[in-house]
Amino acid sequence: WIMGHMVNKIEQINEFLDLGANSIEVDIAFDELGYPEYTYHGVPCDCKRYCTKSEKIDDFIEALSAATTPGNPKFRKELTLVVFDLKTGGFDASRMYKSGKAFAELIQFSYWKGSDDAGRAYIVLSLPKLDHYEFIKAFREHFDTSTFKNLLEERVGYDFSGNEDMGLTRVVLNKAGVNDREHVWQGDGITNCILRSLDRVKAAVAIRDSATGYINKVYFWTIQAYSSVSDALNAEVDGIMTNEPDVIANVLKEDAFKDRFRLATYRDNPWETFKR
């Protein structure tokens, strides 16, 4: 998956897809009570990027639903996966459960439109800290008595992006009600302004490939330098988050990679661990 980073304006959806992305990351900002309010990253962010682009949450989710609904004039078949980078550090932790419920309602009614036929992209809920796990728990429990529980079970995955201990990550996911390998993505990375080793990525890949692991997919963020992309691919990641999707697309065409990797399509299940 080529994961377009910090896609927070409606027009950026097509911009990043046109550059070769098949996935986007969207930053979700919340009000002080934990209700989703708008798309926004804020400073600091990445080098050579504007950090303050924003949309009202309802407007962006409406556009995102259109872009991922077959038959809609704005449908883009390339967009198969959306990572919601949930900025849950801006409100009191006591509101985490209610915030997860509110976001579940937003997805059910504004993205899925209360229908099995709208908003087909797979979703990854990405939390910045392990102690925010009640957001995931609440999101899942919202659908326990819903007729749309099948969409939760088919289309929603989970990630913690804070580069915390992976053994503890497994424990916390289980506390949130997520079983081992139940749609678990594991990210590792840092702003593109700073070089980061692949040590933790390689550890995550080893867990993914272990018979007793809990991870389905591993991704690295945020890179676009040719050497960094090559190194990440050689480490066997499943996704790369980037500001320049065309760079990753071009690297995938190189002789060293063209027979080992291909761009994921909607037929590729992001919850299945790939076996070579």
From Swiss-Prot:
Expressed by the venom gland. One of its GO terms (molecular function) is toxin activity. Its EC number is 4.6.1.-. Disulfide bonds join C45-C51, C47-C193. Transmembrane segments: none annotated. GO terms for cellular component: extracellular region. The active site is at H5, H41. Gene3D superfamilies: Phosphatidylinositol (PI) phosphodiesterase (3.20.20.190). Mg(2+) binds at E25, D27, D85. It catalyses: an N-(acyl)-sphingosylphosphocholine = an N-(acyl)-sphingosyl-1,3-cyclic phosphate + choline; an N-(acyl)-sphingosylphosphoethanolamine = an N-(acyl)-sphingosyl-1,3-cyclic phosphate + ethanolamine; a 1-acyl-sn-glycero-3-phosphocholine = a 1-acyl-sn-glycero-2,3-cyclic phosphate + choline; a 1-acyl-sn-glycero-3-phosphoethanolamine = a 1-acyl-sn-glycero-2,3-cyclic phosphate + ethanolamine. It comes from the Eukaryota. Binds 1 Mg(2+) ion per subunit. GO terms for biological process: killing of cells of another organism; lipid catabolic process. It is found in: Secreted. Its cofactor is Mg(2+). Keywords: Cytolysis, Dermonecrotic toxin, Disulfide bond, Hemolysis, Lipid degradation, Lipid metabolism, Lyase, Magnesium, Metal-binding, Secreted, Toxin. Its main location: secreted. CDD domains: GDPD_like_SMaseD_PLD. Dermonecrotic toxins cleave the phosphodiester linkage between the phosphate and headgroup of certain phospholipids (sphingolipid and lysolipid substrates), forming an alcohol (often choline) and a cyclic phosphate. This toxin acts on sphingomyelin (SM). It may also act on ceramide phosphoethanolamine (CPE), lysophosphatidylcholine (LPC) and lysophosphatidylethanolamine (LPE), but not on lysophosphatidylserine (LPS), and lysophosphatidylglycerol (LPG). It acts by transphosphatidylation, releasing exclusively cyclic phosphate products as second products. Belongs to the arthropod phospholipase D family. Class II subfamily. This is Dermonecrotic toxin LlSicTox-alphaIV2ii. It comes from Loxosceles laeta.
